[in-house]
């Protein structure tokens, strides 16, 4: 072996690429020093990180366990089959495809399976908490299919199931979709399943945000009401970036396999499959149910703390990990609030709320999520503190004197992050 070859296999990133290494170090420090309240984020376990960084990443494969298009895949077969078996056990379904590279890829595969160009899709309005991959303009799903939306009740800000049924009867969609990225309330899968059957539509549940809550028994399961279910393995499931497709429909399963590969994807990500298997195994452990229950409890406390301080919460509360804040009465927009919290080392994101402006710069919502901080070990007391800190910041910004509050807020956040470390080295 030449010296160059030895160096290739043994030189760590800090020596090979100092620029990237510095960014990695900075990101590690950021995750330790900031409290992550972006609802789509979480913190994976050391075991998941180990799988992601394993040499299995070198293996290229297409196809499925026992039926590959490349040799040498016997050990990837083991981890993929483990992921399949664990997904079926965890979510109580008969069939699972664990190969989608993302939740959006999973949704595209379902569209590829069930729809023809021009077919009608009915999904939750984006400003009410829906998702781009459900037929929204600007996404591939909205270019090839005729997209329609249902919405939330303007008073309760909860999905208006009567309106959904009326629109479904009028539109007669081929596919009815529920789920999204910023809907904080429990979803009535049974009611929506009945609506879909009434109008002859397939019923897709995208539970990307709530998959971990479903797995942990903290939210009702979409089965047996859904025809097909997609989700990510990130977010509340605490796994790597990737997607799953689940169903009980035996007749669809072979077609579903082909819809993923070769329909919308080529070779799989072998190391990510291993990490998915690990995270699904973790979610089958009894302590995951404790985690899921704590997520709901923490979100409820955060919402209640903010409400008590005069901060309006969309729909008046939460049943999930998401707390959606309406800043309009404070004279602030979402971007201002996002930047304000960042100054105190709290990470959140601007977000539309029901009937918000279509222009992101004018959104008056801010989305908060408790999953990552709950993974760190924070409980109700810590979220009361966080809610108080956030309310203090919002009030001060609205009054034009945030500078006098930021340093105190930052100190309280530093106390919390020191008490709940991430990946201690």
Curated annotation (Swiss-Prot):
Pathway recorded for this protein: One-carbon metabolism; tetrahydrofolate interconversion
Question: Which residues does the record list as N6-(pyridoxal phosphate)lysine (modified residue)?
Answer: 235
Q: What does this protein do?
A: Catalyzes the reversible interconversion of alpha-methyl-L-serine to D-alanine with tetrahydrofolate (THF) serving as the one-carbon carrier. Cannot use alpha-methyl-D-serine, L-serine, D-serine or L-alanine.
The Enzyme Commission number assigned here is 2.1.2.7
Binding positions ((6S)-5,6,7,8-tetrahydrofolate)? 126, 130-132
- Pfam families, A to Z: SHMT
Please list the reactions this protein catalyses: (6R)-5,10-methylene-5,6,7,8-tetrahydrofolate + D-alanine + H2O = 2-methylserine + (6S)-5,6,7,8-tetrahydrofolate
Q: Name one GO molecular function term.
A: pyridoxal phosphate binding
Q: What is its main location?
A: cytoplasm
Q: Which UniProt keywords apply?
A: Cytoplasm, One-carbon metabolism, Pyridoxal phosphate, Transferase
What is its quaternary makeup?
A: Homodimer.
Q: Does the keyword Cytoplasm apply?
A: yes
Can you say what this protein is called? Answer: 2-methylserine hydroxymethyltransferase
User: Which family is this protein grouped under?
Assistant: Belongs to the SHMT family.
Q: Which InterPro entries match?
A: PyrdxlP-dep_Trfase (IPR015424), PyrdxlP-dep_Trfase_major (IPR015421), PyrdxlP-dep_Trfase_small (IPR015422), Ser_HO-MeTrfase (IPR001085), Ser_HO-MeTrfase-like (IPR049943), SHMT-like_dom (IPR039429)
The upper taxonomy is: Bacteria, Pseudomonadati, Pseudomonadota, Alphaproteobacteria, Hyphomicrobiales
| Uppermost EC category | transferase
